[in-house]
């Protein structure tokens, strides 16, 4: 039996998962990651804490089932995207805390870029909109605001990377400075059409090219783990950003296949194949995980408040004691009783892009109970995801492709049967929950397995993917359209409020 080790470095925790060659979870270890908030709107992580925690979980996962490093055929890495690290090449020490993807300190730089008319250029090259979310302006902030850093960078003494690059550097003892296309595509510095760092964009942001890691396919050889770290050298064979890794772990290998990850927010990606497809509906174009030098793309949209609305019911309204109670409370009523909740607590993301929107609850009557509000809260997750998916389908049809035939789902909230059934009802297509829900880590393991010869092709991986449950739509298309029209009316009210 071949085993694969996936390092899954996320925003709130570092995890290591061992899979067997059938894609089953053999061992899992997790360590929480402290969050650092120096100022309002700023979010940081300690890169050394990330490294120490990730290494500790790898050791713990192996030890928990009596495996040794020589039992592992290959390692895959998946990571929180956009989070930015800058470190000294000689010492391997970071020059500053990592600036996390949620951090908004670079908004003024983004505003300047928009005012200077650079949005069309950046979108054409990167597939992204100008936003502080992405790594490029975070890196510029470090160069401009940390004493002595720009001079060191211009002397070639520093290295930049997203979290995957940082872990690869540490795992290989500083012998490999690399990233994969999916992570590179989230920096706002990478030309997704040419698969190269873009000299014009680097110059625009004043970033020395010497900082940048080598870009490889997602399934490739990234060096070997130093033997003294885990007891034996392990080849690093797969790397992908978390959402692209989840798309791969859901076996969405062909154009037109899509997955939605239901977490604190929701992340929806649809594979679009080898064609760069610019969205006309407020979505981002991003690189999908690549198993060869052939470029692969995906459309991506994010819902800012997904499962977080359940946390708000618990912590803000004190409507429930624990998040697990929400499904039973929502099921105690047949529907939301006309109540519609739009949880625009931090504005609305794709496809609306309305940062000024604020949350609303409409349709309240004397007969409204907390159960109706709980149901409306759950349904809001499905409405937002449906709006995203309908936008993706419009883009697909405009490009001559077929509309989406099914949606594969993962993430914590995908275990909620009521939510998944309502999602299928709104979309009018099957919603499929996989047997293995650790799809992000599984994607990294599969990428490593391909490059190390455990698997021969993505067709072989497709045969390993298994559904746990399929939710079929029960509403007529007319009724689903009525509900979506009511949702869109409620969304318009969030901007008027």
Swiss-Prot record:
Record pathway: Polyol metabolism; glycerol degradation via glycerol kinase pathway; sn-glycerol 3-phosphate from glycerol: step 1/1
Transcription regulation recorded as keyword: no
Record comment: activity regulation: Inhibited by fructose 1,6-bisphosphate (FBP).
Uppermost EC category: transferase
Gene: glpK
UniProt: ADP binding residues: 11, 15, 264, 307, 412, 416
Residues that, per the record, bind sn-glycerol 3-phosphate: 11, 81-82, 133, 242
Keywords, sorted A to Z: ATP-binding, Glycerol metabolism, Kinase, Nucleotide-binding, Transferase
BP GO terms, sorted: glycerol catabolic process; glycerol metabolic process; glycerol-3-phosphate metabolic process
InterPro entries cross-referenced by the UniProt entry: ATPase_NBD, Carb_kinase_FGGY, Carb_kinase_FGGY_CS, FGGY_C, FGGY_N, Glycerol_kin
Entry-linked Pfam families: FGGY_C (PF02782), FGGY_N (PF00370)
EC number(s) given by UniProt: 2.7.1.30
SUPFAM superfamilies: Actin-like ATPase domain
GO molecular function: ATP binding; glycerol kinase activity
Protein name: Glycerol kinase
